[in-house]
Amino acid sequence: MAKAVEVLQKEIGYSNVEALGETLQNIVNDNTAQQVEGLPSQKAAEELNKAYQQLDLTSYSSEEIRRMIQFTFLKAAKEDGLQMNHQMTPDAIGLLVAYMIDQMTKKDESLQIADFAAGSGNLLSTILLFLQ
């Protein structure tokens, strides 16, 4: 994933976080680099597609994928100098919220949880994985 982020940064001039977002979008879109107005170049798109094919996410658990994205985002945020309020919710906070939800709800009760400021989605994914 880091290779794809690097290619997008150099080719399009994206920040680390923007390149990570584009990379994740490309992975979701059948591991295919999207070209808009000729960017990235055909050569770079082929390089990106090769990197996406090498990243076999089916061999990882949901938690491993979440952590891979989290660590890549933390690296990108550090390199970009992101403001504190734009950074990912730490796992410790997610686990604390999940524990509180677990303690305050009935085990057989169906829950609906909404995070209207979802951002990266790390808080919700941490809660979901904890409550499963």
Labelled PLM ranges:
Residues 11, 15, 30-31, 87, ...:
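Functionally constrained cores in energy, signaling, and assembly domains
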Residues 93-132:
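Conserved S-adenosyl-L-methionine
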Residues 82-98:
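Conserved SAM-binding loop and adjacent beta-strand
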Residues 1-81:
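A short N-terminal interaction module
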